[in-house]
Amino acid sequence: MFVPFHKIKQQGFTLLEVMIAISITALIGVASTNLLSNIIETKNVTDKRSEQLVTLQRFNQFISRDVEQIINRGIRDQYGDDQAAIILDDSDYLAQWSRLGWRNSPINDDPRAEIQRVAFQIFDINDEECEAAKLRLESWGKLAPEGSCLIRFFWPMLDRASETEAKTQILLDLVEDIEIELLATTQTPVDQESKTTPERNWYTQWPNLQTGDTKEIPTAMRWRITLPEIGQVERLWLLAYDDQ
């Protein structure tokens, strides 16, 4: 039976339907791209924060071991001059002190002292001392970092010869500011009443010039560190300092 052409039912899509389908597909594509981009960005931020936390934990481990084992043992420097057991804010370092707990290797034929001298200083991130830190920061996408790196120094012997060189470790790749303070407590002379309350003072420089019968001994140390994107981190340690 012959059916006129104008009576045949159309089976395809209209132009409007095609345009709607294309628009929906495009919207889904844009949404998927944005979602993937957000996931990648979130992962990068998470990885970066994770690296920062790992670095901060490593720093905390080093500093805690160093501070908690401070000992009252002065040294002679490379010029033969006597140096105090604890020094804050001198011309060479932010801080330096003597610490116990530097164990000898059981297979070491030349045993060294088990007391170690450590020191800390910051350098501009573009200085040679911070080269490894800058490379790490660049690998994380921070191409033009501004700030300083924190370096730990330690020596193979306490009383140093003129040619003795310190070994170094980068503790923090990028810091904005570091403040180190020492809490000192007055030591009451024996002939005073036992009810006298010892006086406590915070110092950013040590040793403090002590006069008269009043003598101060270090009882605590505080570090305030300002880190980019994290802010200020504060740590406080009590010192088991034997003033004998």
Question: Which positions does each model-derived feature cover?
Answer:
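N-terminal single-pass transmembrane signal-anchor helix
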Residues: 1-36
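Acidic surface patches and DE-rich sequence motifs
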Residues: 9, 77, 227
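Short, mixed-charge, low-aromatic patches
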Residues: 14-24, 74-76, 224, 231
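Short, charged/polar micro-motifs that form catalytic or ligand-binding hotspots
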Residues: 18, 49, 53, 165, ...
